[in-house]
């Protein structure tokens, strides 16, 4: 039944006489499906096959373009550019279907957060594992201000997720890892502009949206966590305990059964193995999706933590996809995201300010990841990582054609609508190859056939309209059918290309190992496509050729003459060995002169 849960008349009061151009409106029905991510194209095709149905049409949602009521929304130029507003339209907000999910936790691992800010408090992550009084919250509004819930401040590490009762005592809304000993439980910040960086980041991650206050965030209704990483006695222009903060955010989210998206809007030069391994552990052991700012220097260089493996590195673009020559660019950058004139929350007076920096670009992108997770709750870290990068718009390279930045701004500028609506890519592995050849080895001049076995990993999407092709760097290799469509590969299934790839090795190729790439492409939709490649090595042996011995029986006789004549008359197509063995005068042409030489060889003249 394809998850159909309701069928109703499209126009309930349409009568038999309500007919126009052959369309009888009283006989049109609307079908509802449980899953809003169903493959509607295939469902439509299935319905059209039913004899009782004449026509099937999509019913597109028609509603006013959703604009949240946050008074500073019109100052947020980037919301429209990255199409967050279009992405929100997938939800029926007016009917109470709200984007976001409170179990999705976006962490500002930074200088700390003014978590009492009126645009943050309603989306504040509250650690209910520490809710000692059981009232369902860990903050209270008392005497005109928000405070940590006194009923939960019992001096006990209630959730004790690290099996150490003396560590994270009463971490009700996050943690200050820079405090004394294990830190302290209040990641609040001084009420001045020097310490506003983490608050500004938090607002971009998940400011409460549609609350008649301040700004909007793409994540809309996800939680925001504060992790303070610099002590108030230190210079707020530095992050002193950033990786400790990263680990807290990752583990706190993991053990609270939430989904952690961690933003690191800080960094610098210099690779550190310990930092890399910390990042990898947080990603693979604690399921944290990590974003980091690529840097604000107009140079091409690696920047850490953004250049570490398992981190989504984000550089900054300006309005209209502009590149204004102030942000870092590098081959390790994954995405570009708006980072100029970005308005968000600050500490002073619970106010707002417009800033620029990759520190802003990174949480703008991370907020999209929160929306993606709320749309696709089954997607995990590597899947969201893959899809947010794959769906970015490469228009930034068209707008900014300067050679020095090509390929250095990531896959493109983030696109919230594409990120939440594009079907999950497959994850393809090459599990086996078979080579069909005339001999036990591949010889110089041979022609072979290649068959591959490809497997699509479980929990990923279907490989749709896939193609494979073989590319080789050697000029002495000819691929007869270099691009080949193959059948779709469903998740957790394998596919064999029963029509083999035909490969000719020239007589001039050097013996030894030569490497080619099997390239796989699928799920192409305009600039979005899944691509992966697999190296395949061919070991080519030097051919031991006896000129004139076309049938390789180690003797030269009349049978070899017959084969040569048939080649000249095009009765047979020679293989690589026959091509060389029949060309007795080595002029690369097989003709009557070769027949004469062959006969003379037989007659021993």
What is the predicted role of each segment?
Residues 226, 241-247, 255-266, 272-278, ...:
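C-terminal subdomain of the subtilisin-like protease fold in secreted/lumenal serine endopeptidases
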Residues 502-542:
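Terminal connector regions
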Residues 8-76:
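Autoinhibitory propeptides
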Residues 478-508:
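Intrinsically disordered, low-complexity Pro/Gly/Ser/Thr-rich segments with frequent PxxP/GP/PP motifs
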Residues 86-239, 257-260, 271, 307-310, ...:
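Subtilisin-like serine protease catalytic core
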Residues 512, 536-605:
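Cellulosome-associated attachment modules in secreted, modular CAZymes
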Residues 110, 303-374, 378, 412-414:
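Extracellular S/T/G-rich loop segment that most often corresponds to the catalytic His/Ser-adjacent loop
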Residues 170-188, 337-364, 395-402:
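The feature captures the short pre-catalytic strand/loop hairpin that immediately precedes
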């Amino acid at each position: 039944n394809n998850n159909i849960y309701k069928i109703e008349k499209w126009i309930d009061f349409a009568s038999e006489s309500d007919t126009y151009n052959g369309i009888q409106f009283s006989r049109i029905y609307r079908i509802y499906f449980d899953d809003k991510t169903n493959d509607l194209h295939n469902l439509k095709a299935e319905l059209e096959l039913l004899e009782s149905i004449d026509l099937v049409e999509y019913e597109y949602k028609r509603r006013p373009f959703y604009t949240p009521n946050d008074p500073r929304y019109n100052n947020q130029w980037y919301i429209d550019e990255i199409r967050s507003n279009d992405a929100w339209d997938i939800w029926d907000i007016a009917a109470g279907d709200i984007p976001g999910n409170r179990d999705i936790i976006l962490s500002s691992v930074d200088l700390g957060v003014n978590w009492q800010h009126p645009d943050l408090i309603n989306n504040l992550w509250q650690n209910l594992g520490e809710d000692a009084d059981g009232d369902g919250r860990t903050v209270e509004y008392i005497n005109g201000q928000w405070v940590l819930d006194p009923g939960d401040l019992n001096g006990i590490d209630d959730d004790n997720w690290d099996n150490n009762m003396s560590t994270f005592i009463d971490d009700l809304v996050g943690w200050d890892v820079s405090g004394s000993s294990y830190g302290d439980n209040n990641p609040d910040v001084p009420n001045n502009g020097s310490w506003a960086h983490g608050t500004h980041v938090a607002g971009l991650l998940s400011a409460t949206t549609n609350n008649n206050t301040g700004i909007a965030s793409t994540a809309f209704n996800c939680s925001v966590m504060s992790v303070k990483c610099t002590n108030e006695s230190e210079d707020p222009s530095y992050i002193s305990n950033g990786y400790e903060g990263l680990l807290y955010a990752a583990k706190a989210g993991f053990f609270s059964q939430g989904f952690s998206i961690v933003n690191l809007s800080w960094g610098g030069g210099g690779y550190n193995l310990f930092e890399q391994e910390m990042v990898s552990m947080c990603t693979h052991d604690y399921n944290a999706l990590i974003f980091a700012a690529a840097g604000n220097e107009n140079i091409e260089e690696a920047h850490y933590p953004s250049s570490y493996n398992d981190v989504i590195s984000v550089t900054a673009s300006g309005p209209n996809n502009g590149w204004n020559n102030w942000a870092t660019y590098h081959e390790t950058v994954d995405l570009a995201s708006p980072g100029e004139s970005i308005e968000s929350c600050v500490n002073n007076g619970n106010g707002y300010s417009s800033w620029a920096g990759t520190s802003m670009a990174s949480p703008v992108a991370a907020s999209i990841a929160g929306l993606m997770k709320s749309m696709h709750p089954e997607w995990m870290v590597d899947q969201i990582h893959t899809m947010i990068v794959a769906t970015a718009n490469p228009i930034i390279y068209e707008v900014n054609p300067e050679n020095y930045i090509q390929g250095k701004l990531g896959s493109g500028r983030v696109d919230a609508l594409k990120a939440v609506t594009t079907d999950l890519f497959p994850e393809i592995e090459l599990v086996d190859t078979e080579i069909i050849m005339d001999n036990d080895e591949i010889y110089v001049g041979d022609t072979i056939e290649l068959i591959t076995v490809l497997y699509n990993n479980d929990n990923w999407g279907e490989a749709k309209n896939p193609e494979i092709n073989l590319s080789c760097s050697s000029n002495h290799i000819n691929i007869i059918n270099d691009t080949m469509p193959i059948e779709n590969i469903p998740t957790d299934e394998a596919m064999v290309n029963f029509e083999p790839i035909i490969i000719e090795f020239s007589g001039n190729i050097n013996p030894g190992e030569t490497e080619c790439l099997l390239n796989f492409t699928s799920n192409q939709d305009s600039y979005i496509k899944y691509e992966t490649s697999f190296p395949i090595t061919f070991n080519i042996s030097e051919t031991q050729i006896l000129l004139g011995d076309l049938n390789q029986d180690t003797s030269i006789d009349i049978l070899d003459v017959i084969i040569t004549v048939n080649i000249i008359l095009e009765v047979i197509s020679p293989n690589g060995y026959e091509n060389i063995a029949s060309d007795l005068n080595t002029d690369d042409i097989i003709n009557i002169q070769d027949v004469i030489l062959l006969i003379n060889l037989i007659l021993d003249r």
